[in-house]
Amino acid sequence: MVNFEKNINELQEKLISVNRVSKTVKGGRIFSFTALTVVGDCQGKIGFGYGKSKEVPLAIQKAMDKARKNMIIIPIVCKTLQHEINGYHTGSRVFMKPASEGTGIIAGGAMRAVLEVAGVHNVLAKVYGSTNPINVVRATVNALKKMRFPMHIAEKRGKSIDDILG
Protein backbone atom coordinates (compact mmCIF):
# COMPACT_ATOMS: atom_id res chain seq x y z
CA MET A 1 0.00 0.00 0.00
CA VAL A 2 1.35 3.40 -0.98
CA ASN A 3 1.51 6.02 1.77
CA PHE A 4 -0.58 8.85 0.34
CA GLU A 5 -3.27 10.77 2.20
CA LYS A 6 -5.09 14.01 1.48
CA ASN A 7 -7.94 15.92 3.13
CA ILE A 8 -10.07 17.96 0.74
CA ASN A 9 -13.52 19.30 1.66
CA GLU A 10 -13.65 17.07 4.75
CA LEU A 11 -13.05 13.96 2.62
CA GLN A 12 -10.13 11.73 3.45
CA GLU A 13 -8.48 10.24 0.37
CA LYS A 14 -6.14 7.24 0.39
CA LEU A 15 -4.11 5.76 -2.41
CA ILE A 16 -4.08 1.98 -2.11
CA SER A 17 -1.96 0.90 -5.06
CA VAL A 18 -0.26 2.06 -8.25
CA ASN A 19 0.68 -0.51 -10.90
CA ARG A 20 2.57 -0.27 -14.15
CA VAL A 21 0.84 -2.22 -16.90
CA SER A 22 1.90 -2.78 -20.50
CA LYS A 23 0.30 -3.38 -23.86
CA THR A 24 2.40 -5.24 -26.40
CA VAL A 25 2.13 -3.95 -29.97
CA LYS A 26 4.06 -4.62 -33.18
CA GLY A 27 6.62 -1.91 -32.38
CA GLY A 28 7.21 -2.96 -28.76
CA ARG A 29 5.50 -2.29 -25.44
CA ILE A 30 3.32 0.65 -24.44
CA PHE A 31 3.41 1.30 -20.69
CA SER A 32 0.66 2.91 -18.65
CA PHE A 33 -0.22 3.18 -14.96
CA THR A 34 -3.27 2.23 -12.91
CA ALA A 35 -4.24 3.62 -9.51
CA LEU A 36 -6.72 2.37 -6.91
CA THR A 37 -8.01 4.89 -4.35
CA VAL A 38 -10.64 5.13 -1.61
CA VAL A 39 -12.39 8.28 -0.38
CA GLY A 40 -14.47 8.74 2.76
CA ASP A 41 -15.69 11.30 5.28
CA CYS A 42 -14.93 9.10 8.35
CA GLN A 43 -18.64 9.14 9.21
CA GLY A 44 -20.00 6.32 7.09
CA LYS A 45 -19.70 7.74 3.57
CA ILE A 46 -17.25 5.89 1.31
CA GLY A 47 -16.32 5.39 -2.33
CA PHE A 48 -13.55 3.76 -4.34
CA GLY A 49 -12.13 4.45 -7.78
CA TYR A 50 -9.81 2.89 -10.32
CA GLY A 51 -8.01 5.10 -12.83
CA LYS A 52 -5.66 4.44 -15.71
CA SER A 53 -3.36 6.79 -17.62
CA LYS A 54 0.05 7.07 -19.26
CA GLU A 55 1.31 9.07 -16.24
CA VAL A 56 0.99 8.32 -12.52
CA PRO A 57 -0.49 11.68 -11.36
CA LEU A 58 -3.21 11.54 -14.02
CA ALA A 59 -4.09 7.96 -13.07
CA ILE A 60 -4.37 8.97 -9.40
CA GLN A 61 -6.52 12.00 -10.27
CA LYS A 62 -8.88 9.89 -12.40
CA ALA A 63 -9.19 7.33 -9.61
CA MET A 64 -9.96 10.05 -7.01
CA ASP A 65 -12.63 11.58 -9.27
CA LYS A 66 -14.30 8.20 -9.80
CA ALA A 67 -14.17 7.50 -6.05
CA ARG A 68 -15.91 10.81 -5.26
CA LYS A 69 -18.64 10.07 -7.82
CA ASN A 70 -19.37 6.53 -6.57
CA MET A 71 -19.92 7.12 -2.85
CA ILE A 72 -22.26 5.04 -0.68
CA ILE A 73 -23.48 5.46 2.91
CA ILE A 74 -22.94 2.70 5.47
CA PRO A 75 -24.50 2.52 8.97
CA ILE A 76 -21.84 2.99 11.66
CA VAL A 77 -22.65 3.40 15.36
CA CYS A 78 -20.06 3.75 18.15
CA LYS A 79 -17.27 3.58 15.53
CA THR A 80 -17.82 -0.12 14.84
CA LEU A 81 -19.98 -2.40 12.68
CA GLN A 82 -23.57 -3.40 13.54
CA HIS A 83 -23.10 -7.15 13.10
CA GLU A 84 -20.86 -9.76 11.49
CA ILE A 85 -20.75 -9.50 7.70
CA ASN A 86 -19.30 -11.45 4.80
CA GLY A 87 -18.55 -10.08 1.37
CA TYR A 88 -17.03 -11.44 -1.78
CA HIS A 89 -15.88 -10.37 -5.21
CA THR A 90 -14.35 -12.79 -7.71
CA GLY A 91 -11.69 -14.76 -5.80
CA SER A 92 -11.64 -12.61 -2.65
CA ARG A 93 -13.80 -13.26 0.38
CA VAL A 94 -13.83 -10.97 3.41
CA PHE A 95 -15.20 -11.50 6.91
CA MET A 96 -15.68 -8.60 9.35
CA LYS A 97 -17.07 -8.52 12.85
CA PRO A 98 -17.58 -5.74 15.39
CA ALA A 99 -15.03 -5.31 18.17
CA SER A 100 -15.11 -3.67 21.58
CA GLU A 101 -13.87 -0.13 22.19
CA GLY A 102 -10.09 0.19 22.07
CA THR A 103 -9.49 -2.82 19.82
CA GLY A 104 -8.57 -0.82 16.73
CA ILE A 105 -8.70 -1.96 13.12
CA ILE A 106 -7.40 -5.51 12.93
CA ALA A 107 -7.28 -5.85 9.14
CA GLY A 108 -4.64 -5.99 6.47
CA GLY A 109 -3.67 -3.94 3.45
CA ALA A 110 -6.44 -2.64 1.24
CA MET A 111 -9.23 -3.54 3.69
CA ARG A 112 -7.62 -1.41 6.41
CA ALA A 113 -7.62 1.66 4.14
CA VAL A 114 -11.31 1.21 3.29
CA LEU A 115 -12.31 0.85 6.96
CA GLU A 116 -10.20 3.86 8.03
CA VAL A 117 -11.80 6.28 5.55
CA ALA A 118 -15.26 4.86 6.35
CA GLY A 119 -14.85 5.86 10.00
CA VAL A 120 -14.74 2.37 11.52
CA HIS A 121 -12.31 2.34 14.47
CA ASN A 122 -12.94 -1.05 16.10
CA VAL A 123 -13.25 -4.11 13.89
CA LEU A 124 -11.80 -7.59 13.40
CA ALA A 125 -11.42 -8.52 9.73
CA LYS A 126 -9.92 -11.26 7.58
CA VAL A 127 -9.40 -11.76 3.84
CA TYR A 128 -9.69 -15.28 2.42
CA GLY A 129 -8.63 -16.31 -1.07
CA SER A 130 -7.19 -13.70 -3.43
CA THR A 131 -5.50 -10.69 -1.81
CA ASN A 132 -5.52 -8.66 -5.03
CA PRO A 133 -6.19 -5.08 -3.81
CA ILE A 134 -8.93 -4.37 -6.37
CA ASN A 135 -10.88 -7.51 -5.46
CA VAL A 136 -10.38 -6.95 -1.71
CA VAL A 137 -11.68 -3.36 -1.93
CA ARG A 138 -14.71 -4.45 -3.97
CA ALA A 139 -15.44 -7.35 -1.56
CA THR A 140 -15.14 -5.01 1.45
CA VAL A 141 -17.50 -2.44 -0.08
CA ASN A 142 -19.96 -5.22 -1.03
CA ALA A 143 -19.92 -6.46 2.57
CA LEU A 144 -20.43 -2.96 3.99
CA LYS A 145 -23.39 -2.43 1.63
CA LYS A 146 -25.11 -5.49 3.18
CA MET A 147 -24.94 -4.10 6.73
CA ARG A 148 -28.25 -2.94 8.27
CA PHE A 149 -29.30 -1.08 11.43
CA PRO A 150 -30.97 -3.32 14.07
CA MET A 151 -33.92 -0.88 14.04
CA HIS A 152 -34.56 -1.56 10.31
CA ILE A 153 -34.32 -5.33 10.79
CA ALA A 154 -36.76 -5.21 13.75
CA GLU A 155 -39.17 -3.09 11.72
CA LYS A 156 -39.02 -5.50 8.78
CA ARG A 157 -39.67 -8.55 10.97
CA GLY A 158 -42.35 -6.86 13.08
CA LYS A 159 -40.42 -7.36 16.33
CA SER A 160 -38.91 -5.10 18.97
CA ILE A 161 -35.25 -4.10 18.91
CA ASP A 162 -34.67 -6.04 22.16
CA ASP A 163 -35.82 -9.26 20.45
CA ILE A 164 -33.39 -8.68 17.59
CA LEU A 165 -30.42 -7.82 19.81
CA GLY A 166 -31.06 -10.88 21.95
Swiss-Prot record:
Q: Which GO biological-process labels does this protein carry?
A: translation
InterPro entries under this entry?
Answer: Ribosomal_Su5_D2-typ_SF, Ribosomal_uS5, Ribosomal_uS5_bac-type, Ribosomal_uS5_C, Ribosomal_uS5_N, Ribosomal_uS5_N_CS, Ribsml_uS5_D2-typ_fold_subgr
Its keywords, alphabetically, are: Ribonucleoprotein, Ribosomal protein, RNA-binding, rRNA-binding
Q: Name one GO cellular component term.
A: small ribosomal subunit
Entries under Gene3D superfamilies matching the protein: 3.30.160.20, 3.30.230.10
Q: Which domain of life is it from?
A: Bacteria
Instruction: Describe the subunit structure.
Output: Part of the 30S ribosomal subunit. Contacts proteins S4 and S8.
What is this protein's function per UniProt? With S4 and S12 plays an important role in translational accuracy.
Task: Report what the protein is called.
Answer: Small ribosomal subunit protein uS5
